[in-house]
Amino acid sequence: MKQKIFVLYTGGTIGMTQSSAGLRPDTALVDKALAPFSDGLDFEWHVCQPLIDSSAVTLQNQRDWLELIIAKLPDYDGILVLHGTDTMAYTANLFALSLQGLDKPIILTGSQWPYDAANSDAPRNLAISVSAFSLKLKQVAIAFDGKLFPAVGSSKVSTETAAGFDNLHFGALAEWEENKGWHNIRTAPTQHSDGLKPRLPSPEAKVSVRTLIPGYAAQELSDGLPHLSTQALILQSYGHGNAPSDDAFVRAVQAFTQQGKLLLNISQVPQGCAAAVYAQGDALRQAGIINGGKCNLETATALMTLAVSHDWNADKVQQELRQLNLL
């Protein structure tokens, strides 16, 4: 019996065509993209109206897609999401954290070049994605350039080559070649699921990001903290989560967290880990900052969005980080 796959086409480069104003999303992809695979799988398409350039994706879009996926999951063997690459890792991470107890594969893919462009990576990425359903995953994953990555920890790492995505902490779940199929499979055994328990993001959730750079005085950042309307802040600090040990900055962090707001400290190093290794990091932890461990920006954004949406406190955020193997 053929597997039934629900295809959610959100937009992105994969289906774009050239217009007088530049590349624009086009629905023509529907008629040809998955036709070569129809002998083995049954596809039902849902084309978002309008199709969205992924740089314009909003929390409302992501919530709408989640609600549609949740409604369709009982009737399908898996979900394929065609998404623009600019924010695909953000969406994948949010899907992964929102869909607790997922027991079917949700595969996201896109391309660096339009489907009809010369030497496009789109046909190969589609072939990889379709083949990934044979692995019977029970999680959200990104299929790109011959590799299947777990959503959590994944990032877009290149705009210049076909190898657009990577997961520097967790690596690939599996690798694919046309003449070998899947190999180097490292999918972990999944725990028994008691059923899907969705945790949807609120479109009104406000999360901000600040990145430390040399010469950007701690005083400037601390002066800005009291005026942030955001409900959670992600701080991209140095190395192991280090920041200036300026007393005013530490006091500002403490005042921010004492308002019940969340401040998550992550490393700006692509393969970094925020932990209180040095005294500066420990001072921030004592002030109420949450060390995000191996959390990358995309995962941190998803985590803080759900934290704000569901009124999580710092202890709950740390519990989630441990469950994600990020601490």
Where are these regions (language model features)?
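Active-site histidine-anchored catalytic micro-motif
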Residues: 1-218, 222, 227-327
